Amino acid sequence: MSDRVYLTRDGYNRLKDELHELLHVTRAEVLEKIAEARSHGDLSENAEYDAAREQQSQTEARIADLESKLSSATILDPKHIKTDKVYILTSVELLNLDDKKETLEYTLVSSEESDSDLGKISVRSPVGRALIGKAVGDKVTIIVPKGELHYEVKKIFVK
């Protein structure tokens, strides 16, 4: 059995919608491409057929992945998230201890919902792992390819 997946209601619904699209639209389109490529004759040197079969393989793998994640999902309600420490679905404001000016804000989410452009980082990322369990006032050292970054947890909240 796979690991438990923690999702927001929106994240769960997005994955469910993607699964529905794959099952009811993409799968049929791929089967049409395979049938079309087969109609061109010799399959041994048919790049179109090979590409369609590869797309089918990727589609079926994604379907299996989504079904697994959705079946092991726990939907988290932000209203029930504690803010005494950094947990999944909490947002955290960090002060850069090296320059005392820069502040960063991240929201910790599951890998399935991470989006760095929106400040949503995975609890499994190096930054997420460093922050989990920290409380306001705690110092955090985050190891990145360029070296170490030093922050202090200034605020923990739920959006």
UniProtKB/Swiss-Prot annotation:
The lineage of its organism: Bacteria, Pseudomonadati, Chlorobiota, Chlorobiia, Chlorobiales. HAMAP family: GreA_GreB. It comes from the Bacteria. Belongs to the GreA/GreB family. The keyword Coiled coil applies. It comes from Chlorobium phaeovibrioides (strain DSM 265 / 1930) (Prosthecochloris vibrioformis (strain DSM 265)). GO terms for molecular function: DNA binding; RNA polymerase binding. GO terms for biological process: DNA-templated transcription elongation; regulation of DNA-templated transcription elongation. Pfam families: GreA_GreB (PF01272), GreA_GreB_N (PF03449). This is Transcription elongation factor GreA. The keyword Transcription regulation applies. Necessary for efficient RNA polymerase transcription elongation past template-encoded arresting sites. The arresting sites in DNA have the property of trapping a certain fraction of elongating RNA polymerases that pass through, resulting in locked ternary complexes. Cleavage of the nascent transcript by cleavage factors such as GreA or GreB allows the resumption of elongation from the new 3'terminus. GreA releases sequences of 2 to 3 nucleotides.
